């Protein structure tokens, strides 16, 4: 039995619930559990809550292993080339050979496959066109906003579409999410975006991604204590869902904690931030899950990256403690990150104590480790996914640490290096998915 779309409309459930989908693609099946799990999975994909989406798609396939949309969903949330990806691609190809597809099912399948193939611009354009033609297709309208935001559409047109969607569905948490998401990179999020994010989190209080986005916008607005509260709520919600999610894949849970530590630092609660960072560094596992990968890069190095932001050069004991907490395995890319950050921080301490010759030699070590990181660019681009995101963030953190060291060491040219640092900090950090991120470069 297939999972078939019934028509070209999606039903918008009046009442929000964590157990039942809000956006519902009508499917032909004698098993209501299949449709429920499939739509919950598609909602999680929309939010890029990938670890929870995997759970729902697995449940869909347990109900009917011939559900083509569930196989497509699995392709969306597994890295290409992984054993899981190959398994579901093979299953999908076998089903497509004999399938009789309805037009809407064929459209969604082909468009999501276009997305899986990496054609973000084409997929975004397709959903935009569909949302214009089929005004009742709320899911298409949401995908239009999210994908075109990722594709870097700017200006009033996308905001207008998001506002129109929200006017038609004022109590739909996904329409609210779409409007809030558009202010993700704004240095001053609008009142409309903040209100949308708040209402979305209130409608689905058990969804950690919505708390993350609201916390992110609050932090961007300077409302740091409120942001910390939202990150705490996100962590609690994500922890509650670990019964469905392998801890090794718990990206959202870890991002909540990383963002909380970052916000504590930004709020001036530096003791709290450092305490949290050392706690997180103890939660690192060198496994292959996406949560493990995230913590290997971000959790390990967090104490060092916070010390980089300290206005005055840290004491040697603090540097040593942070390096010990990192303890990256020798020969790994993260070890270059660790050694680069340590050398850059030490350079500042040496410069402040006027040991300029030793400081210069130490800075050279930091620059050498950064050079080694740059040599890994091709490998990381081939790996893609979360590894590439973490690698790009590590590069930016190391560059910022070295520029701060140069400012401390080269007094005669510190204005030049400060300009370079300001330029670096003005660039958006590499995106984490879900689409919120802890910012560690800014003091």
Regions found by a protein language model. Name each.
Residues 30-59, 109-119, 143:
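Alpha-helical segment of the N-proximal tetratricopeptide repeat
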Residues 33, 40, 74, 110, ...:
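Structural register within alpha-helical repeat arrays
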Residues 47, 81-82, 117, 151-152, ...:
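Structural motif corresponding to the intra-repeat A-B loop/turn of tetratricopeptide repeats
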Residues 70, 140-141, 175, 210, ...:
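TPR alpha-solenoid repeat register
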Residues 85-98, 121-131, 155-168, 189-202, ...:
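Alpha-helical repeat scaffolds
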Residues 33, 67-68, 103, 136-140, ...:
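Residue-level recognition of tetratricopeptide repeat
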Residues 44, 78, 114, 148-149, ...:
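Residue at a conserved register position within TPR or TPR-like alpha-solenoid repeats
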